[in-house]
Amino acid sequence: MQEIPAILVLENGSVYRGTAFGHAGEATGEVVFNTSLTGYQEILTDPSYTGQMVVMTYPLIGNYGITPNDNESKKIWASALIVREASNVYSNYESTRSLDATLKEAGVMGLAGIDTRKLVREIRQKGAMRAVISTLCDDVAALKAQAAAIPEMTGLDLVQRVTTGERYTVDNPDAKYHVVAFDYGIKTNIIRQLNAEGCKVTVVNAKTTADEVLAMNPDGIFLSNGPGDPFAVTYAIDTIRELAARNSTLPIFGICLGHQLLSLAFGAKTYKLKFGHHGANHPVKNLLSNTIEITSQNHGFAVEMESLPGELELTHKNLYDMTVEGIRHRELPCFSVQYHPEAAPGPHDSHYLFKEFTELMERLKN
């Protein structure tokens, strides 16, 4: 593989030089790091990474290639992938192509050969930053100015970029429940888990109205993960608030961005984390069962603990930084978690939440 020099310039002027793989050219976005050892395919195709360049802390990436069934959506959403070493050799009984070839076909840049430990420390200490990767320009001052001109994630509604254009249904022949899932950037494995729990899932556009949803006669509402600032997605917040007000026996379950939107709908506030939670090894305490769960996480915003209104009960707490990881309404059948119980990649400690959702639908259906 021919080595093409590439440069990464952060908005603060820090420079990292390496080589490009995948697509050569230019990429922009917010730089975040992910601590997962595996799962790069799922990470790249997770719509929640829209507008972000992902640094993998594990030093060797690409060694098991790309498999046909592990995408979390139909395309790569991350702006770029940054690694210490990109493996030219891949081996896995299901893999059909290399990471390099996949990125190249998708027009997505990869950057290898940089000191990722140094970059991660800088992000950890100074916060997630906007940046530019380029094989076309070596002018640091110009690239720094370009990075500084990238829109900040705060105030950015990216949901409209990733949501489905058309409603679609993923059926289960033995389905007992009909779930309407708002697509704010939904992952494939979430739909798969809902199917496994006996749900027919109708996936709808993020701007679908409460009237349209209720006309589908759902047994439950699911609020998906997604990218950007939850506070900017005002249409979703208003719809969730209306759904909860109009039907007090309709279960609502939110994950990640969906958790933040549900919290905002009931009057809580959100804020941007310094560098976010991105990885598959975050310990969370379940305050209801007094147990610890190892969780998969991917979010740059969080719900403000002090802003939780009286009707919302804190159910889960992050043991790294004590941030809100789960809430439930004290009277309405509404609950949510900040992390990803469906994992992909990650542990399966929290799969029980899908069962709790179906049990809630069963109880209120009868």
Curated annotation (Swiss-Prot):
Transmembrane segments: none
Active site positions: 256, 340, 342
Glutamine amidotransferase type-1 domain sequence ranges: 178-366
Gene Ontology molecular function, alphabetical: ATP binding; carbamoyl-phosphate synthase (glutamine-hydrolyzing) activity; glutaminase activity
PROSITE patterns in UniProt: GATASE_TYPE_1
Keywords: Amino-acid biosynthesis, Arginine biosynthesis, ATP-binding, Glutamine amidotransferase, Ligase, Nucleotide-binding, Pyrimidine biosynthesis
SUPFAM superfamilies on file: Carbamoyl phosphate synthetase, small subunit N-terminal domain (SSF52021), Class I glutamine amidotransferase-like (SSF52317)
Region (CPSase) location: 1-174
Catalyses which reaction(s): hydrogencarbonate + L-glutamine + 2 ATP + H2O = carbamoyl phosphate + L-glutamate + 2 ADP + phosphate + 2 H(+)
Pfam families: CPSase_sm_chain, GATase
Binding-site positions, L-glutamine: 48, 226, 228, 257, 260, 298, 300-301
Gene Ontology biological process: 'de novo' pyrimidine nucleobase biosynthetic process; 'de novo' UMP biosynthetic process; glutamine metabolic process; L-arginine biosynthetic process
Key word Oxidoreductase present: no
Pathway stated in the Swiss-Prot or TrEMBL entry: Amino-acid biosynthesis; L-arginine biosynthesis; carbamoyl phosphate from bicarbonate: step 1/1; Pyrimidine metabolism; UMP biosynthesis via de novo pathway; (S)-dihydroorotate from bicarbonate: step 1/3
Enzyme Commission identifier(s): 6.3.5.5
Quaternary structure and interacting proteins, as annotated: Composed of two chains; the small (or glutamine) chain promotes the hydrolysis of glutamine to ammonia, which is used by the large (or ammonia) chain to synthesize carbamoyl phosphate. Tetramer of heterodimers (alpha,beta)4.
Family as reported in the entry's similarity comment: Belongs to the CarA family.
Protein task: Small subunit of the glutamine-dependent carbamoyl phosphate synthetase (CPSase). CPSase catalyzes the formation of carbamoyl phosphate from the ammonia moiety of glutamine, carbonate, and phosphate donated by ATP, constituting the first step of 2 biosynthetic pathways, one leading to arginine and/or urea and the other to pyrimidine nucleotides. The small subunit (glutamine amidotransferase) binds and cleaves glutamine to supply the large subunit with the substrate ammonia.
Protein name: Carbamoyl phosphate synthase small chain
Gene source species: Chlorobaculum tepidum (strain ATCC 49652 / DSM 12025 / NBRC 103806 / TLS) (Chlorobium tepidum)
